[in-house]
């Protein structure tokens, strides 16, 4: 038969300890529940211009939202190659990504115009276009495609490397098997040079160069340095044939659910990330040639660019029909 003796009453000290423990438990739970974790992915290493972009962005988001949002950063295509990552953001399976503009025309065709060869005079010109009315209007074109484009950033001017021969004039490119991005404008232009184009995800490029699957590739100095392409490429020519922007992208439905103040915090964080990203590109461009030469690459930095432009005259005529001569001239003449 169970005892009917009353249980001892807890002391006031025990009650206070219990209350404190419950308070801490519920407090920690509330804090954990209040913090939303998101992910952002890049295709390059952390120690790169893209790494600077997303590391800065993650820090700024947490700071500007009082820690209510935490952005986890992933490098070396840990969450997928650029095209896969962009598609994942569009579908909502990933929250954020930072991508070069290479695969973007497959999702937002209006951005193709930015990939026309020799469209921009220099980085100052490109940045002025992207930060001005033309670039900001292009950002709005992402809204209807499942994205919120938070800010333009930078990959840089693209240059050609290969393991076969020094490229001093356009004819030297003929017959080279080159990895290209999955970008229709790039592919059309490189075919105009007589290049055998091989579209390939960035994560596969080093091995393809190492094994001789392709002869060469083209990328900005920042990418060539961080990817250590000097280990598998002998010749580099500073062609500067295409300017490659980059973008902070967020799933549109997710962005729309944020309070207005938080939306602005994400935009401002992306802009700060872009600012430091561009500074890193400037740094890499300033020291990159000397670094790569010291590592054994032959670097040609004095080509007659007008000859390369002339070699693409038939292709550029097609681009004028595709995009409109007036639209191209508007970009070329922007200050």
From Swiss-Prot:
(R)-pantoate binds at residues 50, 82, 155-158, 179, 219. It comes from the Bacteria. The keyword Repeat does not apply. InterPro entries: DctP_fam, TRAP_DctP, TRAP_DctP_sf. Its main location: periplasm. Transmembrane segments: none annotated. Belongs to the bacterial solute-binding protein 7 family. This is Solute-binding protein Veis_3954. It comes from Verminephrobacter eiseniae (strain EF01-2).
């Amino acid at each position: 038969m169970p005892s009917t003796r009353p249980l001892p009453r807890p002391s006031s000290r025990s009650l206070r300890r219990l209350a404190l423990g419950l308070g801490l438990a519920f407090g920690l739970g509330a804090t954990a529940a209040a913090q939303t974790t998101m992910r952002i992915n890049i295709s390059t290493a952390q120690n790169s211009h893209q790494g600077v972009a997303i590391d800065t962005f993650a820090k700024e988001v947490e700071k500007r939202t009082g820690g209510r949002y935490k952005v986890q950063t992933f490098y070396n295509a840990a969450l997928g190659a650029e095209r896969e990552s962009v598609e994942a953001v569009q579908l909502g399976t990933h929250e954020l990504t930072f991508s070069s503009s290479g695969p973007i025309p497959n999702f937002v065709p209006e951005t193709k115009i930015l990939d026309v060869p020799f469209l921009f005079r220099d980085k100052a010109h490109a940045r002025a276009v992207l930060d001005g009315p033309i670039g900001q209007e292009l950002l709005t074109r992402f809204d209807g495609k499942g994205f919120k484009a938070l800010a333009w950033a930078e990959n840089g001017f693209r240059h050609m490397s290969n393991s076969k021969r020094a490229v001093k004039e356009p004819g030297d490119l003929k017959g080279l098997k080159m990895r290209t991005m999955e970008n229709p404008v790039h592919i059309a232009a490189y075919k105009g040079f007589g290049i055998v184009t091989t579209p390939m995800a960035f994560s596969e490029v080093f091995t393809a160069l190492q094994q001789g699957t392709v002869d060469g590739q083209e990328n900005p100095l920042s990418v060539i340095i961080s990817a250590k392409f000097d280990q598998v490429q002998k010749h580099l020519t500073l062609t500067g044939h295409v300017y490659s922007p980059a973008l902070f992208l967020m799933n549109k439905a997710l962005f729309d659910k944020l309070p207005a103040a938080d939306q602005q915090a994400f935009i401002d964080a992306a802009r700060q990330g872009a600012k430091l990203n561009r500074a890193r590109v400037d740094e890499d461009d300033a020291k990159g040639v000397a670094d790569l030469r010291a590592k054994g690459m032959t670097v040609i930095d004095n080509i007659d660019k007008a000859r390369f432009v002339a070699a693409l005259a038939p292709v550029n005529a097609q681009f004028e029909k595709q995009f409109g001569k007036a639209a191209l001239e508007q970009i070329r003449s922007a200050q």
